[in-house]
Regions:
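Catalytic-core regions built around general acid/base machinery
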Residues: 11, 15, 46-49
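Membrane-interfacial amphipathic helices and adjacent loop/beta segments
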Residues: 1-14, 90
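Cytosolic-facing loops and C-terminal tails of multi-pass membrane proteins
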Residues: 116-120, 124-155
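A cross-family acyltransferase "interaction/gating" segment
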Residues: 20, 32-111, 132-143
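Short, hydrophobic-biased amphipathic alpha-helical segments
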Residues: 8, 94, 109, 113-121
Length: 155
């Protein structure tokens, strides 16, 4: 809800004022590793105006071949995702690529900052995959609810 977002933004402002590094995941979730969702820029309003000396450093997290398994995709809740991933046998590789930091002062507003970061991440991810990113389509089948028959109790 909007109050939670405001509280999170205030916490980010306090952290930046205390010279802490902060991490924001602007997709808000994970994908299959072969696509990139639109960035939600609300948390980047902490950079309006940018605190002195603050830089934005885009980062790519690449789980390689297990991206679809690791990803939190669809209607799975957080606990079930964590249990599924932790129950997996063996190990998996995570490649972290730190891209060139940029000054948010060079961009006008949170949406422009988010667009710049997304552009950099998209370019790196595309180069890693050796193919263009595909459109991510989150589809959930409709579930129909039928009220039980009051006489029989059956749906």
């Amino acid at each position: 809800n909007r109050m939670d977002v405001a509280q999170q933004i205030n916490a980010l402002k306090e952290a930046l004022a205390d010279n802490w590094s902060v991490t924001v995941f602007p997709e808000g979730t994970t994908t299959d590793g072969k696509s990139l969702l639109p960035f939600k820029s609300s948390m980047l309003s902490v950079l309006e105006p940018p605190p002195p000396g603050v830089l934005v450093q885009p980062v790519v997290l690449d789980y390689g071949e297990v991206s679809e398994f690791i990803g939190w995709i669809g209607e799975e809740d957080g606990l079930n995702n964590a249990m599924r991933v932790m129950a997996r046998k063996g190990s998996f590789r995570l490649r972290i690529t730190y891209l060139e930091p940029f000054s948010p002062e060079e961009y006008h507003g949170r949406k422009a900052i988010a667009a710049k970061a997304r552009e950099e991440i998209e370019e790196e991810l595309g180069a890693t995959l050796d193919e263009p990113l595909r459109d991510f389509r989150h589809t959930v089948e409709a579930i129909r609810y039928f009220a039980p028959d009051p006489k029989t109790g059956e749906s």
